[in-house]
């Protein structure tokens, strides 16, 4: 099991492009960042022309917190151009790139310019190591998608964490640190397992985030306290 640095803690990001969900999660006082992707933006019903203004709204809503915005280009030049443009929208925007030849090349160019990159769609430890060496500030392994094909995503996550935490990444990216974002989270247990392994971050959709928050015994206890207090108040 990977050993965490003293004083570090699992951080919660929300995986959505929905402004209301982001505002609600932020109101809880424990939100540390946001991740988005083209599919999540499509779910908002927004138009293509509104994509960048929408990312800007998220960044403004979450000032000081990293907000990952993904490029849709498929070439190095396109990814770099998209990345530069998105990064210019707000200082807290992180550029999300897919792990592929073009993604690695674009990552190195953007990282050398001081732009933070979140390398996504990571499914193996070798991909994670390549991304970190190309300058990725964040690495996003997708645990839930392993479950979809009856494989163990948590064991793959464990390998990635061990490999990344074995090394000092000083000078490789703008911050000299590589953080692992556990992504494609479907259940509260995914979050627990990520925390046990020492992942830095879990990015969680609102549905799963509420599963992390609520428990039937907690809900029953709150209802009982409220009922008892109402009897006291009405006595």
For the regions a protein language model found, what residue spans apply to each?
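C-terminal alpha-helical cap/extension of soluble enzyme domains
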Residues: 164-235
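Histidine/lysine/aspartate-rich catalytic loop segments that bind and position anionic ligands
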Residues: 121-156, 160-163
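Glycine-rich phosphate-binding active-site loops on the catalytic face of alpha/beta enzymes
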Residues: 33-34, 38-43, 121, 138-150, ...
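Alpha-helix-loop-beta-strand connector modules within alpha/beta enzyme cores
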Residues: 52-67, 104-117, 153-176, 180, ...
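Conserved, mostly hydrophobic/aromatic
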Residues: 37, 95, 131, 194, ...
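Active-site beta->alpha loop and helix N-cap motifs at the rims of alpha/beta catalytic domains
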Residues: 10-14, 18-22, 28-31, 36-109, ...
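Glycine-rich beta-to-alpha transition loops that act as phosphate-gripper elements at the mouths
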Residues: 15-18, 72-77, 97-101, 119-126, ...
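Catalytic cores of alpha/beta
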Residues: 20-28, 78-82, 106, 124-134, ...
């Amino acid at each position: 099991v990977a050993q965490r640095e003293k004083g570090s803690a699992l951080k919660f990001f929300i995986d959505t492009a929905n402004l209301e969900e982001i505002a609600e999660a932020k109101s809880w006082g424990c939100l540390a960042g946001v991740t988005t992707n083209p599919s999540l933006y499509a779910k908002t019903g927004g138009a293509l022309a509104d994509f960048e203004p929408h990312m800007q709204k998220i960044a403004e809503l979450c000032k000081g917190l990293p907000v990952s915005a993904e490029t849709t280009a498929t070439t190095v030049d396109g990814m770099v151009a998209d990345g530069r443009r998105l990064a210019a929208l707000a200082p807290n925007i992180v550029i999300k790139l897919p792990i592929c030849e073009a993604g690695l090349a674009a990552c190195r160019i953007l990282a050398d310019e001081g732009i933070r990159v979140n390398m996504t769609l990571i499914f193996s430890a070798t991909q994670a190591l390549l991304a970190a060496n190309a300058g990725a500030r964040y690495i996003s392994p997708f645990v839930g998608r392993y479950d979809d094909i009856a494989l163990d995503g948590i064991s793959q996550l464990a390998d990635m964490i061990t490999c990344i935490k074995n090394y000092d990444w000083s000078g490789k990216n703008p911050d000299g640190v590589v953080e692992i974002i556990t992504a494609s989270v479907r259940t509260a247990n995914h979050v627990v397992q990520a925390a046990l392994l020492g992942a830095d971050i879990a990015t969680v959709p609102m549905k799963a985030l509420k599963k992390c928050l609520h428990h039937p015994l907690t809900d029953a206890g709150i209802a009982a306290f409220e009922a008892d207090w109402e009897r006291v108040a009405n006595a």
